[in-house]
UniProtKB/Swiss-Prot annotation:
InterPro entries: Ribosomal_uS2, Ribosomal_uS2_bac/mit/plastid, Ribosomal_uS2_CS, Ribosomal_uS2_flav_dom_sf. This is Small ribosomal subunit protein uS2. The lineage of its organism: Bacteria, Bacillati, Cyanobacteriota, Cyanophyceae, Synechococcales. Keywords: Ribonucleoprotein, Ribosomal protein. NCBIfam families: rpsB_bact. It comes from Prochlorococcus marinus (strain MIT 9303). GO terms for biological process: translation. GO terms for cellular component: cytosolic small ribosomal subunit. GO terms for molecular function: structural constituent of ribosome. Belongs to the universal ribosomal protein uS2 family.
Length: 239
């Protein structure tokens, strides 16, 4: 049975690429045609790639690999958080901070600081501080929650990065490749398929397209871990 059908992808607008002048020639094998100055993605190729990505992701999850979902653009932010949480993965959905992977020791210290501040807030320790100091601590807490909240359960580097919009997340791509962390990437017609291990050619701007792809990948992770794609948990948060 196909992981995703052609009609589902059509309804999600997964076939719409970018303007032809913005294309990356390396994506030519995934492009069906050009229409009104816009490239149309070959959804038969997308279906094949989705099947491969599902199997690869499921196998990785079954072997205990940990996942990081990355997508900071407005259209993807909410979906990234939702689907990562559903399959127990970590996520970055606001802004990629330099060194999130390559300077992990420093990043982990900031995550630990976030946890400390959350404990202080919940215990009332911040409220007991002088008003000015409490205000400073709460601003720090708010900022850390915004940018690092999706990483609180990530005790070590991820084994796999799932990416929305390769062009936007250039720093995440560079850091993952530097550390030999494989990438499962949604690739629009302006992307480079050579920069990922598991390509999924599709529209990475439409919310429904992002929902469709990330939803299936989250299903694959849950199936690999639990034998069902309905399981919800926080497996990446467990040692």
């Amino acid at each position: 049975m196909a992981v995703v059908t052609l009609s589902e992808m059509m309804e999600a607008g997964a076939h719409f690429g970018h303007q032809t002048r913005r294309w990356n020639p390396k994506m030519s094998r995934y492009i069906y045609c050009a229409r009104n100055g816009v490239h149309i993605i070959d959804l038969v190729q997308t279906a094949i790639c989705m099947n491969n990505a599902y199997k690869w992701t499921r196998s990785s999850a079954r072997s205990g690999k940990r996942f990081l979902f990355v997508g900071t653009k407005k259209q993807a932010s909410e979906v990234v958080a939702l689907e990562a949480t559903r399959c127990g993965a970590s996520y970055v959905n606001q802004r990629w901070l330099g060194g999130m992977l390559t300077n992990w020791t420093t990043m982990k210290a900031r995550i630990d600081r976030l946890k400390d501040l959350e404990r202080m807030e919940s215990s009332g320790a911040i409220a007991m501080r002088p008003k000015k100091e409490a205000s400073v601590l709460r601003r720090e807490l708010e900022r850390l929650q915004k940018y690092l909240g999706g990483l609180k359960g990530m005790r070590r580097l991820p084994d796999v990065v799932v990416l929305v919009d390769q062009r936007r997340e250039t720093n995440a791509v560079l850091e993952a490749r530097k550390l030999d962390i494989p990438l499962v990437s949604m690739l629009d017609t302006n992307c480079d398929p050579d920069l990922c291990e598991v390509p999924i050619p599709c529209n990475d701007d439409a919310v429904r397209s992002v929902q469709l792809v990330l939803g299936r990948l989250a299903d694959a992770i849950n199936e690999g871990r639990h034998g069902t794609n309905e399981q919800r948990g926080a497996d990446d948060n467990d040692d």
